[in-house]
């Protein structure tokens, strides 16, 4: 029996099973070969082997092709060849898109690698793992980063700050095995701020509900939501969830209005 491999992710066949059928019949005037219909009494043909299974899971099917040959004297003969198709049908890999957040005034020009705290590194690691698998489904997929700063500070400073944030996220994703050319980055400075009504709406949907102290100090929470990098999956335009990590161990450092010390940020980033 012949064996061929097959793999499909979502609606895309990643590894197609193929084989070449060869046949020859003597003393015959006509022949047919299964679903291929009428064929010459001798010949060969390349066929694509598609399993009948459509559901996700392992694939292990035996496909049979029977050659029926006849002649004008009423004689007939048949021969069957079997091809076993083994592989898998898999769902489209999930890419968990969540925005990442930064402490006040980080990173800095002097310390451009500082400010991506552990909880946000974990968020990006999960995203990177999913995206690398997703590339098997769509090799042309890309990530688009949009970085922001809160409203405090001069416009030029915030433009630089958001650029540092975009670059830090890109560098981290590259360190996780994503090619740099797969990542576009745009820095918005303090433009396109989330307004307070939007932040209130986001908080109602956030599975990480804030403690009472942060509910009372809404101004600090609003500012914290605007110190972030959003992520878009292209070409689907699936956007990252803006869930603020209130339950993360380093959330206080992310949330506080004053700029935290370098030592505190280093301790939460390593």
Predicted ranges, named:
Residues 24-31:
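Short proline/glycine-enriched turn/loop motifs at strand-loop junctions of beta-rich domains
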Residues 142, 146-247, 251, 257-258, ...:
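Periplasmic OmpA-like peptidoglycan-binding domain that tethers envelope proteins to the cell wall
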Residues 11, 87-134, 151-156, 219, ...:
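Short, solvent-exposed beta-strand/turn patches at coil↔beta or beta↔helix junctions
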Residues 39-65:
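Solvent-exposed segments in extracellular or luminal domains encompassing
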Residues 77-86:
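C-terminal edge beta-strand
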Residues 17-22, 102, 107-147, 170, ...:
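Periplasmic peptidoglycan-binding/anchoring modules of Gram-negative envelope and division proteins
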């Amino acid at each position: 029996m012949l064996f061929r491999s097959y793999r499909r992710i979502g609606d895309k066949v990643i590894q197609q099973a193929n084989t070449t059928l060869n046949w020859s019949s003597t003393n015959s005037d006509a022949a047919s070969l299964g679903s291929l219909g009428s064929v010459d009494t001798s010949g060969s043909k390349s066929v694509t082997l598609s399993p009948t299974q459509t559901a996700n899971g392992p694939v292990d099917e035996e496909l049979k092709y029977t050659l029926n040959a006849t002649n004008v004297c009423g004689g007939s003969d048949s021969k069957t060849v079997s091809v076993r198709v083994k592989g898998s049908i898999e769902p489209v890999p999930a890419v968990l898109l969540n925005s990442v957040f930064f402490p006040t005034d980080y990173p800095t020009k002097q310390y451009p690698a500082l400010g991506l705290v552990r909880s946000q590194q974990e968020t990006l690691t999960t995203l990177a793992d999913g995206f690398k698998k997703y590339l098997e489904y769509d090799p042309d997929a890309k990530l688009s980063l949009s970085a922001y700063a809160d409203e405090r500070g001069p416009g030029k400073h915030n433009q630089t700050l958001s650029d540092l944030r975009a670059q830090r996220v890109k560098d981290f994703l590259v360190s996780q095995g994503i090619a740099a050319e797969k990542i576009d980055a745009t820095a918005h400075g303090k433009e396109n701020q989330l307004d307070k009504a939007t932040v209130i709406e986001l908080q109602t949907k956030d599975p990480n509900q804030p403690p009472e102290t942060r509910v009372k100090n809404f101004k600090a929470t609003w500012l914290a939501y605007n110190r972030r990098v959003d992520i878009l999956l292209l070409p689907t335009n699936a956007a990252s969830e803006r869930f603020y990590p209130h339950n993360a161990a380093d959330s206080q450092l992310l949330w506080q209005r004053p700029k935290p010390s370098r030592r505190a940020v280093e301790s939460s980033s390593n």
